[in-house]
Amino acid sequence: MNESKLLSPNGIVKASALCLLMSAFSVNAAFAVPVLDREVMVIQQGRTLTGTVVDNFGDPVIGANVIVKGTTIGNITDVNGTFTVENVPDDAVLQISYIGFKTLEVPVKGQTTFNITLQEDTENLQEVVVVGYGSSVKKDLTTAVTSVSSKDFLAGAVNDPMQMVDGKVAGVVVNSVAAADPNKSGSIQVRGASSLKAGNSPLIVIDGMPGGDLRNLAQSDIESITVLKDGSAAAIYGSRGANGVILVTTKQGKAGKTTITYDGYVEHDFVASKPDVLDADAYLDKVTGAVDYGHRTNWYDELINKNNFGHNHNISLSGGSETTIFRMSANFKGKEGLDIASDRKEYGLRGNFKHTTLEGLLEVGGNFSYRIADEDYTDYASFKQAVQLNPTFSVDEMDAFKGNSYSFNPVKNLTEQENGAKQEYSTIDLNLKLNILKNLNTELKLGRQGHNKKQSQYKFKTHKDCINGNYNGYALLKQEAWTDWTLEWLGNYSFKINDEHDFKIMGGYSYQQFDYEWFSASNRDFPSDAFLYNYLQGGEYEKVNGRLGMESHKEEEKTIAFLGRINYNWNDVFLFTGSLRHEGNSKFGEDHKWGLFPAASAAWRVSKLPVFENSSAVDDLKLRFSYGVTGRSGFDRYTAQAKYSGFGQYYSDTYGKFIMGYGPGNNPNYDLAWEKQISYNLGIDYTLFNSRLSGSFDAFIREGRDVIGEYPVPLPPYLHDKIYANVGTTTSKGFEFQVNWDAVQTKDFSYSTNLNLAYTKSKLKSFSNEKYQLGYIEGDGFPSPGNPGSAQRLEDGIEIGSFYGFRYAGVDDAGNILIWEKGEEGGVTKLGADGNEQDKVYLDGTGVPKWELSWGNTFRYKDFDLSLFFRGRFRYKVMNQYEMYYGLQVVSGDNKLSSAYEENAHIKGPKVICDYFLQNGNYLRLDNITLGWTPKLNTKWISNLRVYGTLKNVFTLTKYSGVDPTTVTTTGLWPGIGGMEVYPTARNLTFGVQITY
């Protein structure tokens, strides 16, 4: 091994991480728990209990916790499943628990010997599911809610927590187009896109705090992720609930002995697929205008960090007594990107506690977290340049690109600059709960979420921008700060009438304030690169009068809400939930600050009918229907208000200096209100064959009203030619199907499978009225060279994601693309270069997958388990920019894809946006394969051990000729464009260990 590499900082970090991971196997220490005086009295007065704990196959359960409920007195079972607990009183209750089994409570009642059988925790109808401002037993849900617990998360390395449930929830799309970039998070969309200007991302709620940031979480700290999909479930969150709500619950402490858990892994990324570019010899042989500069460079490979390494370590401490429970964790995570520039290091602390006092009258609890992320960024433009650049240039070549804004050295573009950020995330909240009566309580919650980001960038004088701009260095410092304050006061009351009518009532008040500040300063032309971005005043550029190198900005938003909910259960047969939220928000127009968001849902437990009374097949069968009104408010703050803006500096003869000119910066709209969404959902939940088969089916319709758009207005009377107004209407329809089947269950072998299938179709019904008219909205134009225009358009009655362009009609004798005039196939043809608006039509297909599929399979043989997880998207198209720009021979001197001289060899002319480049995006991928070992250990110190290996992105079946179909955005308003600035797709290998002491 190269000694210099071994002793480098990077080498030391890698070696240390590996040592830490392996050292977890050799820990041999006990953790002592102090014994309370009250427990000493128990020891002096009780008796000795012995017993055996087995599973439903009669095998001993090794390492099960056996404790006296409400105390820390207890023991764990040995290799034979036996236990001994001394000095236990006759009226005590034993609590037996083990991972993967249902917790069991057994009264002592004077016994001294126990034979205990634990049941596997499969589909538990009594499972408690978190919902908005509360929780519910799973079997009593009346809305479309899906919860994924930590035991069902996808294994392996992730950039953000939602990747652990990607494909696990029908109707939820997690679009990770650059999964191997450590600083990139995926976009999330629930049941399609419906908004033009107010956002399509769901609300994130972490431990009850709305507006949370998922990157403030270590994946090992998450207990469950719950998605509120329909309007009735999300309406309790008012103007932020229309895009769905994601509730994240972190792990909490449990009463009993204190446990220490280590959860860690190491990982490595491989390039899974890359563009098929001509090598240097093929380039010189085939490309017109090719020039040989004497080198043989694979630009794409030069950008890849083949020795990338990632590691993640989480240590947690958890435990408690009858009155106090706690959990604390520390996390360190480091990941190098698949490219030579990107990197990320994270350090985090998280803790929570709950203390009950005054004989249960008062509960005090809280959460805190602090996380630092040190980020180094990359530039995706380098990967675009790596495809088109002459492969005979030297890796160090710079002079050839002077004054050329089109071509640059992609390697130097990354190495000749420092670009990154330091981010701090913090959360603290305190909860006070007063249990006035057994069925009446009130809770006060105060919380603060903070996020600070300091971005710094320095381009050396050898960077392409500095060379072309003729200045020595460029520096930028940018600071952003987000602060969210939350105050909530809730009350809960429950009562029963004649043991048949069960009522639960919740009412509350919510206040939330969002503050945002932003500051940016830049300069250029420095005497030296040595100071980087730490010497802004040294640059000469901003010293010239009339040049302003600083900007600052501040925003504030407030939300106040009064909310209530009632749950009614008649004899466990008929269930009803109704909720109402009255909310005011400072973002809206002066005359529309307040909104009302009602919701209602009902369910009928069909399995209670006499026909199912003695059925051995039907455990639970429930039909439900829901209606809800939600809102959407994700547009920019102050859009409704009048704003003044600077319009440049002007020299004043009167004052002898430059003075900033100000004027109205927009057209205010005091009638601007929240977007409304009316949702209907019909669903069925089923559990069959002693919980072996379970699942759900949902059909939904969502109607968007008062959708915000930007509309042209006349000058005068308006001061500007555009205004924001509530005009549009949208619709989304679809259905979702989920099924879980424990197919085989024997003593040594089991097999379970689950399938999720979702169909979604979204359409823009209209976005014009008598006052505001807008014919259509064009998507983003394609990049230079040339001006090919846009490939997508939004128009009344057209599906979101529709493609718009020419119909391909072949080529002429010179190899120029021909199109059908007026889009009429079989009619008159013309040159694509001569095409006009009259020749454009809506092309077949959209960029939104109609079908989303996931299929999970888990096999267990004795102590080993194997899981395979497949994902797929179907019935959608992709406009392949790679083929359009690099798969044609027309641009002289640029490198090409091999397809330019193979599949596309007949095309010699310029690119044209037509359906020739519109490809089938369908794919099926073996996304995750995990092999794990969970041995039954013969040790008193280690209660649980799991070792696993995960391979992600194993293979992909697709006809798409681009780099990878998953690099194409399929969410938002403009899905299905296969861009060129594409980060490499990775195949990830992870080895991990989980140990509980």
Per-range role (PLM):
Residues 63, 87, 115, 127, ...:
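Extracellular/lumenal ectodomain signal focusing on beta-strand-rich modules
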Residues 1-358, 362-367, 371, 402, ...:
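Short, small/polar-rich motifs associated with maturation and membrane association
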Residues 866-926:
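C-terminal beta-barrel architecture of Gram-negative outer-membrane proteins
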Residues 153, 201, 207, 284, ...:
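Extracellular/periplasmic, surface-exposed regions of secreted and cell-surface proteins
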Residues 846-878:
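Glycine-rich, aromatic-lined ligand/substrate-binding cores of catalytic
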Residues 261-295, 520, 524, 725, ...:
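Conserved small-residue
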Residues 382-410:
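Acidic, glycine-rich flexible loop segments
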Residues 445, 508, 565-567, 623, ...:
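Exposed, low-structure sequence patches enriched in small/polar residues
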